[in-house]
Amino acid sequence: VNMDDYVKDQVRSKLIRVKCMNLMAKEKGVVLSRTQKDAVSSAADTFFNALTQEQVSALNVTKDQIEKMFTEFAIADTLYDDVTSQINTEVSSDDARVITIQYICAGSKSDISSAKERLDNGESFYSVAKDFGGEEESETECKRGEMEQAFETAAFNLKTGETSSIVEAGGKYYIIRCTSDNEKSKTEANKTALMDEKKLEYFNSVFESYEASKYVEMNKKVWNSKKTANTAELPVSFETIFNELVK
């Protein structure tokens, strides 16, 4: 698959999903509020007025068509919020916790025991880790679910400044030092991301069978004639305007 076909497939899938979401919204009686309609109108004005006459001609688009597109995306967004409002998306602060650690990694028990002995004798964690990790500083941020379970358990049980005993995980041996047991701003961001993941997972479980039951026909002749390489760069972004004025 070449890049042109890949991009077009992504756009096609997005447009089909939005169309199907609008069908579901109609069946569920989901409509835009007056405030949302005003926001859509403002977004369409902003987008259309930013285009030159040459760009309007090249796109072969009218203001009404642009407003219809903003409307359909707004309805899809409203449906998503309506469906996902029915579930509990709460994520605990501990589940979302982001920590920062340093670690020493060795391929054998004897090597990691040697590293531990050096630490016990007062050498700095950084200097020992550097010897085992080459020039790279073995420091990283960690979230739950990203590491081997034994490594994760040991890392998340540490408080800031604490060092673990020897941990075996994935066929290797580690000593872990916690430099921060809670990166608070990143924990909050991760909490939001995990809640969004829960929403998307639930929505997909509800929507995908519905979408599969619908047949959306596209004008293949027109669609196949479109090439992303021939698309001129526009002074405005549909997605940016939608997120700023409508979402």
Model region roles, listed by residue range:
Residues 1-61:
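N-terminal targeting/tethering segments
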Residues 4, 8, 12-13, 17, ...:
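Hydrophobic (often cysteine-bearing) scaffold residues that line and stabilize catalytic clefts
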Residues 20, 111, 124:
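Residue-level recognition of oxygen-bearing side chains
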Residues 55-117, 130, 149-247:
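PPIase-associated folding chaperone regions across multiple families
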Residues 125-134:
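Short, well-ordered alpha-helical segments enriched in acidic and aromatic residues
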Residues 139-141:
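Short helix-loop boundary/capping segments
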